[in-house]
Amino acid sequence: MAILSSALVTIDLPVTLVSLLVGSIFYFCYLTVYRLFLSPIAHFPGPKLAAWTYWYEFWYDVIAEPEYTFKIGRLHKIYGPVVRINPDEIHIADPDFYDTIYAGSGRKRDKWDWITRSFGVDESLIGTLKHDEHRVRRASLSPYFSKQSVRALQPLIDRNMAILLDRLREFAKSGSPLKLDDAYAALTNDIVEDYAFGRSDHRLEAPDFDPSFRDAMLQGGKAGHVLKHFTWLMDLLKKLPDSLLLKLSPAMGAYSQLQTSVKRQVAEIQHAHQMHTYDKTRRTIFHEILNSKLSDYDKSTDRLWQEGEVVVAAGTITTAWALGVSTYFVLATPDILRKLKTELEAAIPDPSQPLNLITLEALPFLTGVVQEGVRLSHAISHRLHRICPDETLIYQDNDNQREWRIPPGTPLSMTSNLVHHDERVFPDSHAFKPERWLDNARLERYLVSFGKGGRACLGINLAYAELYLTLAALFRVYGTEQVKGKDDVGTLQLFETSAADLVITSDTVVPVMPEDSKGLRVKVS
């Protein structure tokens, strides 16, 4: 009997291997035929290799550099405004079609799990796939990011801005170069953490402004390109301790440590809420969520830490980058600085008095500076995805006299970088020109750094408040050697920094400086 069993195993093993081989070949052939000829989007233009396999995107984002976002721009120059960029996805490059894809909450827009799963925050607002579930979760957070709520936050922003101005005076005394990109990340992080959790890590007070949170998020963005192709890897990494993960992958280790920190903060808030030991006079986002009518699951630690990570990350990185871009161009362009200081001096006669956000928002040139900073910082370097589950979208390609009918359920995307550098909308698009926004309200339609529609960035009002208040407070009392105001307390001079330091050279989801850049540095005097 044992001999017979051994013989059967000997016979079955080759048969099994052959069956697997034949099955694999059959599946490979079927997948090839389906993707290239039978898919509902098989007729859309684009490279056949991209239509056939996801390895095409993998090559540009993982093997070469995280640069598929730039390759997509080059593909549009070859194939036109509609391009199939992988087996399932259509990318559009037409600013006038943006509002159709990123429609308001009255039209259903889902997200694509192939993208959202790469961040490991599937239960957060940005990771919520279905339109209706997203709307419920968003409704629980929206009140805390309304214009009224954000204006009530001004004392918090002012306190942190005062700390930053104190730090500038320290650097003036020491003569050391100040890394403003780190300082701005510390500023925005301290503000959003305090609002979210009722406490902050006081990064503004750290000697080096403690850029660890920002750096961990950027490393997580790099890892995301790998993780979206290998979903099992995310599950494996979650099971490893941070100490081991740091050795295997410093990028993922730093990102995991960040998540551990956010989990701890959310757990502490939940414990204080259960024990009724939190300060009820302070209105913070996550204390209020626990008092909301959301389901018990939506209030669980497993979900709320993901929301916490997204709120803090989005509230830190994108606004800090926009501040950096704005500051560089203002300092590098004397005429812009002169016009800005003239406007600020007229609107703020006494710089020692608290700023008025409503007054600042009405200043046309300051608004132009803010809008150009937002436009050229892009906020998100990656394309934004949407799925229209129940409607066929029709794109009219007028240049080529072609109508494209995009089937329901097809992942669609556009990229802010391509919209903001469309020369038909923004002539001389790479130039920082605040005056392009003066008496030109139509341009606001094409400013898409924060997305649009029912899934637009929730923190847009907070971001704008920080931009207005920070730039006004800074340039009301600081000038340069070439441009000085009567009430200035010092000057800021760019130090070994050029426009090349602000060029986005890789896609880590959010913009990041070139690897050889030393940052946005200034000398304070």
Swiss-Prot record:
Localization in the cell: Membrane
Cofactor: heme
Enzyme Commission identifier(s): 1.-.-.-
Molecular function GO terms recorded: heme binding; iron ion binding; monooxygenase activity; oxidoreductase activity, acting on paired donors, with incorporation or reduction of molecular oxygen
Annotated Gene3D superfamilies: Cytochrome P450
Entry binding sites for heme: 457
Membrane spanning residue stretches: 13-33
Any one of the GO CC terms: membrane
Function: Cytochrome P450 monooxygenase; part of the gene cluster that mediates the biosynthesis of terpestacin. The bifunctional terpene synthase tpcA converts isopentenyl diphosphate (IPP) and dimethylallyl diphosphate (DMAPP) into the sesterterpene preterpestacin I. The C-terminal prenyltransferase (PT) domain of tpcA catalyzes formation of GFPP, whereas the N-terminal terpene cyclase (TC) domain catalyzes the cyclization of GFPP into preterpestacin I.
Cross-referenced PANTHER family: CYTOCHROME P450, N-ACETYLTRYPTOPHAN 6-HYDROXYLASE IVOC-RELATED
UniProt-recorded name of the protein: Cytochrome P450 monooxygenase tpcC
Organism: Cochliobolus heterostrophus (strain C5 / ATCC 48332 / race O) (Southern corn leaf blight fungus)
Primary gene name: tpcC
